């Protein structure tokens, strides 16, 4: 089974958590695209979706799924999204696709965060995948200097502007042994919009695509 087939297995397995008549929180990325395809088979049975990115919105709308603005929805039953890395405590690095801030907002209003990944994303310690930080453009150099003080090696992701009009610094060389503490430290830097650590709001359910099919941990 290829990596993409494992992603597909995870994405389709998440469909069992979708309730008829509900509004579904939808993330961003290659694994989520498979979930969106699966969700399309229920387009007549759900109210719609809250999307974390322009890319996902376009894909959902193409399948006839109504999009709700985050401000129209008080809460969501579920939020389905992928991760770049996930540890045993279900803390994650996200934001490889530059949608981390909107992903964090949609995750915050969801009762249940369902993380869909392939088996390559599980790690003992977060940080091998560079940690994305969304930054207001005028603060880029200042934030980078502060990230160096925290032990990181920040790299400006050239040519990328987020859906919010900001820039991304990818922080290399961090072994993140206390994700919640680091999430707080980075979010406290003036000019940071948010960091791609999902530690305070980790996953409630992890669905991993494996060569044998989808493995669900609740």
Swiss-Prot record:
Keywords: Isomerase. One of its GO terms (molecular function) is ribose-5-phosphate isomerase activity. One of its GO terms (biological process) is D-ribose metabolic process. Its EC number is 5.3.1.6. Pathway: Carbohydrate degradation; pentose phosphate pathway; D-ribose 5-phosphate from D-ribulose 5-phosphate (non-oxidative stage): step 1/1. Substrate binds at residues 7, 28-31, 81-84, 94-97, 121. It comes from the Bacteria. GO terms for cellular component: cytosol. Gene3D superfamilies: 3.30.70.260, 3.40.50.1360. It catalyses: aldehydo-D-ribose 5-phosphate = D-ribulose 5-phosphate. Homodimer. Catalyzes the reversible conversion of ribose-5-phosphate to ribulose 5-phosphate. This is Ribose-5-phosphate isomerase A. It comes from Vibrio vulnificus (strain YJ016).
């Amino acid at each position: 089974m290829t990596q993409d087939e494992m992603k597909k297995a995870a994405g389709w397995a998440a469909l069992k958590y979708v309730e008829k008549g509900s509004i579904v929180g939808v993330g961003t990325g290659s694994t989520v695209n498979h979930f969106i395809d699966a969700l399309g088979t229920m387009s007549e049975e759900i109210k719609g979706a809250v999307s974390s990115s322009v890319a996902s919105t376009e894909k959902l709308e193409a399948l006839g799924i109504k999009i709700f603005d985050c401000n129209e929805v008080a809460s969501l039953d579920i939020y389905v999204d992928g991760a770049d890395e996930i540890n045993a405590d279900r803390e994650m690095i996200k934001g490889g696709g530059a949608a981390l801030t909107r992903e964090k907002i949609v995750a915050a209003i969801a009762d249940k965060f369902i993380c869909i990944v392939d088996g390559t994303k599980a790690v003992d310690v977060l940080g091998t995948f560079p940690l994305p930080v969304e930054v207001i453009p005028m603060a880029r150099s200042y934030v980078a200097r502060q990230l160096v003080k925290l032990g990181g090696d920040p790299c400006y992701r050239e040519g990328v502007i987020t859906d919010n009009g900001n820039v991304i610094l990818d922080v290399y060389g961090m072994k993140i042994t206390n994700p919640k503490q680091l999430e707080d430290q980075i979010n406290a830097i003036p000019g940071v919009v948010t960091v791609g650590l999902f530690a305070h709001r980790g996953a409630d359910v992890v669905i991993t695509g494996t060569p044998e099919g989808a493995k669900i941990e609740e």
